[in-house]
Amino acid sequence: MKPRFAISSLSPAWLLAGLLWLLPGCKSDIDPARLENLRDDLDAVITGARGAPPPEDAARGGWDTEVFGARAQETLEAFAHLLDSPPGKAPADGLLAEEFTSSALRPAGLEETFRDRHFIVRKAPAGKQAASRKGRDGLEAALGELLEAFAGSTGRHSKLKLFEVALGDGNSARTRTYFQLGGRFEEGTFQVKATWLSNWTRAGERWLLKSTEVESYEEAIGLTGAESLFTDCTKASLAGSAAFRSQLLPGLDHWMGRIELRMGIDIGGWQGLAIGDIDGDGRDDLYVCQPGGLPNRLFVQNTDGTVTERSAELGVDWLESTHSALFVDLDNDGDQDLLVGLEPGVLIHENDGKGRFTPKTARLLPAALPYSLAATDYDLDGDLDVYVCCYNRRKGANRHLVFARPVPYHDANNGGRNVLLRNDGRWRFSHATVRAGLDANNRRFSYAAAWEDFDNDGDQDLYVANDFGRNNLYRNDSGRFTDIAATAGAEDISPGMSSCWGDYDNDGLMDLYVSNMFSSAGNRITSQGRFHQGASEETRAQFRRHARGNTLLKNMGNGAFSDVSEAAGITIGRWAWGSKFADLNNDGWEDLLVTNGFITQQDTGDL
């Protein structure tokens, strides 16, 4: 295994402490207005300050909407879990108002909107659904009608996300909830997603469900067997590898208890992977990045689809914390070279054509940690250049601690500095960020970037997805970039996680998809009147936008984009990460793959 490849990093904490100690005795030339702006920024990240989100004890914090919302969620889940397999415990009496009414939970007259050999999709027609079910018997009948569609299924699981709460005169309330139910059959899978509008009435200390109406409904059938679109081949391909069994399968929790944090391991699991044909045999191979203290792994594909782990043999088993890697041909010799984003910077390897790698150069990044890599020939000189997203500024040994400290939370500008590495040939790479114009608005928390010629002028433009705020759209004009995200309608102020380009509507123009985080709690809280009462309406709207979810930006062909996310139905990707346009069913239309989740442990409440 390779030794640790590291540079020292001096923490500025002692210097900052000294400056703070000296400040009271120094004459200040700081503009009071700037101090007030700083206070506002700090308020945005201090829980409970100036009407910020509620503490864990919502009742103590005076957030009656959250107290009620928790009760409403419990009531709705009690009924929804009757649909699970095995079904949940029957709800107690006294949860429904005597005058309770409900529409059918699986509306009649479903319209088929899509069919191919893999999927069938049906939707409820637009319009208000009749409240035809009454009382507890009516609700149980509505649940039973929905369950009939799942007759014979196994593994049924329901999920509710209560995303809107409105309290009325003290005795009435309204909620909106996203509902999803899925199950498996021998011949396929079945999934339902719907939006429920519910009204509530108070009876003493209790809240009773008064009515439920299905505002939207969609069901999708996935056909398996010979027509299965995907097959999980993880075990068939990787289980024969000792490295897979002993290192990857135990999971991060296992290694967190065995490797010191200062080696570069943390619970976030911020590691990526790279795919490429390293030896020219026509089969893709897999490079898996690992946290500090564990060697990166290179799985070379065999003729039968299994893999052989060869990282040490081929010279790429680095032990340094690695967030990203990329296979690209950097020297134009026809094989896939390797870039690896290690903790100190980017290490660049040459491929000998047979899959054996030799480190040729390293570009240290002393200001920030490299998180992701994207390559293109931005200056049209015939070789590939590299853009490095750097997310966090360096903080010494405690460089990450799972979450960043953005200021202000929803529009942070205190992140890492991204870097453009220009390929000057003969394995020489120079820092070209400033001279190329890419240092403008370059202190965000950048997770990912995607190159594309969105304006069809012959050069590659760059979109950067930033966590905690606005994104960047850098238009390329003959190798010089200008950030036009604001004027182009492409800032998408959100917790950006990834971005990808694709012509989703087949109009010849490349459109843009950005994965963010959908938060039901964020939607509820930011819509309340008491949320950040001292902030401007613009700031409040930005917080609401932050919780909305994913974004689809349609290229209008005039240098601008239109947000069509809600009309296209793509906002709810949960806590989304990587995303990719791909025509999965070969029908000529770009589909979307979106990964989601975060920390997976034995606790079922984990994301």
Language-model-derived ranges and their functions:
Residues 8-12, 27:
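Intrinsically disordered, low-complexity proline-rich regions
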Residues 12-23:
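Bacterial N-terminal signal peptides
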Residues 1-8:
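N-terminal secretory signal peptides that target proteins for export/translocation
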Residues 26-607:
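Acidic, glycine/proline-rich Ca2+-coordinating loop motifs
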